[in-house]
A protein has these predicted regions:
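Bacterial N-terminal signal peptides that target proteins for export
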Residues: 2-10
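Bacterial N-terminal signal peptides
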Residues: 10-20
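Extracytoplasmic/secretory-pathway proteins
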Residues: 23-150, 155, 159-169, 182-357, ...
Length: 672
């Protein structure tokens, strides 16, 4: 390949590459633990209400969890008649086509007695159930009770399809009658008995396609709540939630809202019950009802009454400690932690309190125990920070990330990096910062060589579908770019994650090495210019910093606010010096453009000033958008030193390729 055609071939290659995606507005950005280290260590993230509820209550032995048949928590916009359609579909199971048609006809009647007459050909359980359903729909609750009881009185082998249905409907009927009957207490008790029977029938294997066994928990909870038993209602809804019903979750949220509205005296009495205490605690540590950082109106009342009712409590002590810590009651948090045991949350709080007390050794030990105690898969879900960054909170990863802050302060830089890197993508921004700014290139390379093998390259289809790179590939790319920046050209190539990047890195490195070894000035100039062109065209991919100042992690499309790193309680002088030593040169956004311009200037240094190549190199470099100052300096250099050329009228915009071959001849002529 001729030297003068080299960038043209590269241009052809670049035009064949897919264009990067253009975003109309900025994306959400993940939280960075290292952005404000003191705040990170001081704050205890709010819990997740769904996760907190999963810790409460007891599942019913033998009762199956709900399936997709009745549970789709993501379907927020389901059809209003979806429940009726599901019932109609389930009602057809086990029936012949003629029986299905007849049941549909009977459902449309308004006289339950006519159901018995016209449905005489149906099995007794089907006929009795439809008759009871018609009676219920028309408001004849007493007649409905009679039909459902008749069905349940049949021998077990004669009612395999409708036993669970009948018991569940019987419970609903008695609940409706509780507002009509003279003895409300008796009606509610019979309703509760029926729902318990429905649950047991489901456990015993009677047909339950609508999963009424789980639904009965919520219905029974409603009965219990109507009888004034908040504690019992909460326990039933908790069980329903544990069996996978979204109704259990939403009902507990509603109960919590109702509790918050109660007068203080009534709420204080209810808070003597464990289940009420636990529900209120779960809500408070999860900050339910908060909006954009604004505290709900009843929050302080709930906190005060809960603290008054749980002093010295052994139950739920770690959550009570968390609630106290979030409220700024650190003495109260310490008191609860005395009885909080050795769970992950308890040790996390002890670590934070040790940081507050200035005991970093105790904090480090507590963080270590917290990381060991939290399950690997514990997930508190998605949250927003006060500055609207997002965090997918996995406590084990978060604890290790906070521990990394203390490791950095102690000078244990590799340990800090590993703790952040283990979070996978969650705290990648922090891991990347340590990898390219705090670790030496030798430390980083050794870790990658020993622990981060190259993952399989993404297929073209995966790239077309914007499948993100594995974090391992991102780390290896980061190392490859850093090696190129620091002059380790031959070593860098293998770390890039695909052949295209490897080829670009190889071309850049070859031209830099060629420039270093060339003894003839124009050959050196040609190689420097080609390296400069490569740096300008592909610098983000092969030279860019993952984080500041280039933000290769965003393809350079966005940048994040940064603050100058200064020595402080959590930042050592040694770390500051390491970060200064590894900062971009110059420390400007798209720093590789400045690298390209500097290489082009060096190319011009090796060319006869009267040559076309000298003018063309400066002209091209002036169009590389490094800065207005550099553009002006390049033009001024051309004015002072370069030859007159016609295309100088559009300097920096319309520039020919440098004619290095003729420059070589001119150089020989000038020398001789």
């Amino acid at each position: 390949m001729l030297t003068r055609n080299w960038p043209r071939h590269l241009l052809c290659l670049s035009l064949c590459l897919p264009l990067g995606s253009a975003l109309a507005c900025g994306p959400d950005f993940p939280m960075r633990l290292l952005d404000n280290r003191g705040q990170t260590l001081a704050d205890l993230p709010e819990g997740n209400f769904n996760f907190e509820l999963s810790r409460l209550g007891k599942a019913i032995a033998g009762l199956n969890n709900v399936t997709a048949a009745t549970h789709n928590p993501n379907d927020l916009y389901g059809e209003e008649n979806a429940a009726a359609e599901a019932r109609d579909k389930a009602e057809q199971l086990g029936l012949s086509a003629d029986q299905q048609t007849l049941v549909k006809q009977l459902r449309g009647l308004t006289d339950a007695h006519q159901v018995e007459v016209q449905g005489a050909s149906l099995p007794a359980e089907i006929r009795l159930y439809v008759a009871g359903a018609v009676a219920f729909a028309t408001g004849d609750h007493q007649l409905a009770v009679e039909y459902f009881n008749k069905l349940l009185a049949l021998p077990a082998d004669q009612r395999p399809l409708r036993s669970t249905w009948a018991a569940y409907s019987l419970g609903r009927t008695w609940f409706a009658m509780s507002s009509e009957a003279g003895d409300k207490v008796v009606a509610l008790e019979r309703s509760r008995d029926a729902f318990r029977q429905a649950r047991q029938l489901s456990i015993d294997g009677f047909s339950d396609p609508l999963e009424l066994g789980v639904a009965s928990l919520g219905e029974e909870a409603r009965v219990v709540r109507a009888a004034g038993d908040w504690n019992g209602a909460i326990e039933l809804y908790e069980a329903q939630n544990l069996h996978g019903s979204a109704v259990g979750y939403t009902s507990l949220k509603q109960l919590m809202n109702e509790l918050a509205e109660l007068p203080e005296a009534e709420l204080a009495e209810l808070l003597q019950h464990t289940s009420v205490q636990q529900l209120v605690t779960a809500s408070l540590v999860s900050r339910q009802g908060w909006s954009f950082g604004d505290e709900p109106p009843n929050e302080k009342k709930l906190v005060k009454l809960l603290q008054n009712s749980t002093r010295g409590s052994l139950e739920n002590a770690d959550r009570l400690a968390a609630m106290s810590y979030q409220q700024g009651d650190y003495a109260g948090a310490k008191a609860f932690l005395e009885n909080a045991g050795d769970g992950g949350l308890a040790w996390w709080l002890r670590a934070k309190l040790a940081v507050r007390d200035g005991d970093k050794n105790a904090a480090a030990a507590a963080y270590s125990k917290a990381a060991q105690a939290f399950p690997q898969k514990e997930d508190w879900g998605y949250r927003r920070t006060p500055d609207w960054a997002y965090e997918s909170l996995q406590p084990k990863c978060r604890v290790e990330g906070e521990s990394a802050i203390l490791a950095l302060q102690r000078g244990e830089y590799l340990q800090a990096f590993v703790q952040l890197y283990r979070s996978n993508s969650t705290y990648w921004f922090d891991a990347a910062t340590v990898a390219e700014r705090v670790l030496t290139v030798e430390e980083l390379k050794k870790y990658v060589d020993d622990n981060v093998p190259a993952p399989p390259a993404l297929t073209q289809q995966e790239r077309d579908n914007y499948v993100p790179l594995p974090v391992a590939a991102s780390l290896r790319n980061l190392l490859g770019r850093r090696l190129l920046r620091e002059g380790h050209y031959a070593e860098a190539v293998a770390y890039f994650d695909n052949p295209d990047l490897q080829n670009k890195a190889r071309l850049y490195g070859e031209q830099r090495l060629k420039a270093d070894s060339a003894w003839w000035p124009t050959k050196r100039a040609s190689a420097l210019y080609n390296a400069a062109w490569t740096a300008r065209e592909w610098g983000m991919d092969i030279l860019g910093y993952e984080m500041a100042p280039d933000y290769a992690t965003f393809g350079g499309n966005f940048s994040l606010e940064t603050t100058e790193l200064t020595v402080g309680p959590l930042v050592s002088e040694a770390e500051v010096q390491r970060q200064k030593a590894s900062e971009a040169k110059p420390d400007q956004r798209y720093h590789y453009r400045f690298v390209a311009t500097e290489l082009a200037s060096r190319a011009a240094d090796n060319l006869p000033h009267t040559s076309q190549a000298f003018a063309a190199v400066l002209c091209n470099a002036a169009g590389w958008n490094s800065s207005l100052e550099e553009q002006s300096a390049l033009y001024q250099r051309y004015i002072k030193e370069g030859p007159y050329v016609l295309w100088a009228v559009d300097f920096g915009n319309q520039c020919p390729y440098p004619d290095f071959e003729n420059a070589d001849k001119r150089y020989v002529t000038q020398v001789t």
